[in-house]
Amino acid sequence: MKITWLGHSAFRIETGKAKILLDPFLNHNASFAGQDINDVSSGITHILLTHGHGDHVGDTVALAKETGAVVLANADLAAWLGSKGVDRIEMGNTGGTITLGGFSATFTNALHSSAQITEDGVSHALGNANGLMLHFDDEASIFAMGDTDIFSDMGLINELHQPDIGFVPVGDRFTMGGAVAALACQRYFSFKTAIPCHFGTFPIIDQTADKFIDGMEGSKTQVKALKPAESLSI
């Protein structure tokens, strides 16, 4: 398995059976600058979305049309994507699991909102915000928390799924900050590896993952604070 952080909450995940983009906010992502969208979307089989905000949906519509990738999203967001011409969609909702050729995705809770803002400035709700629990055939498992605060049922998610790797939002203001994210990882999860995300993209969120790294000091979990475009092989 090869995991590449594309900046913000966008990741490319490559396994022997799937090539996945998670929350592909690319073209307007300052952390993505200097990377080639054609390279990172090459050969993708699936696009996975945690929720409907623009900094997570990002370039999904264009990429889905260009590549023919299957898009996974909650039911309300899936309906919106369909209205934009995306025709290969797998929809689900909190608690549901979908098998997708080489891996499965389970929608979990996340404490956040989910919406798109139209040109008139009105926010239109698009279902629940979710985390995504990804189980791969003969590979490490990943829990992409999505945008969230800490909540005690994270412990139940860990009990049910025992994820090996966590994608953890740490930027504060719109998600939990680094210190709280470290508490969440140490109290509720038994990750082998934690990868911080959702930081450094906008001036009003934390610019580094330092608070998370400091909070994880002494933990059995290995923290991998990747740079944009940096990859980790598992």
Curated annotation (Swiss-Prot):
Signal peptide: none annotated. One of its GO terms (molecular function) is hydrolase activity. The keyword Hydrolase applies. SUPFAM superfamilies: Metallo-hydrolase/oxidoreductase (SSF56281). Keywords: Hydrolase. HAMAP family: UPF0173. Belongs to the UPF0173 family. This is UPF0173 metal-dependent hydrolase RHECIAT_CH0001941.
